[in-house]
UniProtKB/Swiss-Prot annotation:
Disulphide bridges: C44-C59, C51-C64, C58-C84, C66-C82
Primary location group: secreted
GO MF entry, a single one: calcium channel regulator activity
Residue ranges the record assigns to the propeptide: 18-40
Protein name, entry field: Omega-lycotoxin-Am1g
Keywords (A to Z) from UniProt: Calcium channel impairing toxin, Disulfide bond, Ion channel impairing toxin, Knottin, Neurotoxin, Secreted, Signal, Toxin, Voltage-gated calcium channel impairing toxin
Species this chain originates from: Alopecosa marikovskyi
Other notes: According to the nomenclature proposed by King and colleagues (2008), 'Gsp(267)' comes from the species name 'Geolycosa sp (strain A267TDLS2-KZARNA)'. This species has been reclassified since that study, as indicated in the work of Oparin and colleagues (2016).
């Protein structure tokens, strides 16, 4: 009799506590997910010399955008800059 009461209480405790364990796991996943996304975004938004060959291509939905820019105010020399950006 005592053993059956023990098992009943044991199963009630498991059923009562189990949702808390699941919620904790979901919270842990939500906490680590932004860190992974942030790392991915940093690797997607990188400066490059050209958009050709896409060795380290832009991550979707980012696209490679290039433009020419003068090196300094008094210089006529232009430099090509490329960067992954959202369009």
């Amino acid at each position: 009799m005592k053993l059956s009461i023990f098992f009943v209480l044991f199963f009630i405790a498991i059923a009562y506590c189990q949702p808390e364990f699941l919620d904790d796991e979901e919270d842990e996943v939500e906490e680590t997910l932004p860190v992974a996304e942030e790392g991915r975004e940093k690797s997607c938004i990188t400066w490059r010399n050209s958009c050709m060959h896409y060795d380290k291509g832009c991550c979707f939905p980012w696209t490679c955008v290039c433009w020419s820019q003068t090196v300094s105010r008094n210089s006529s020399r232009k430099e090509k800059k490329c960067q992954c950006r959202l369009r």
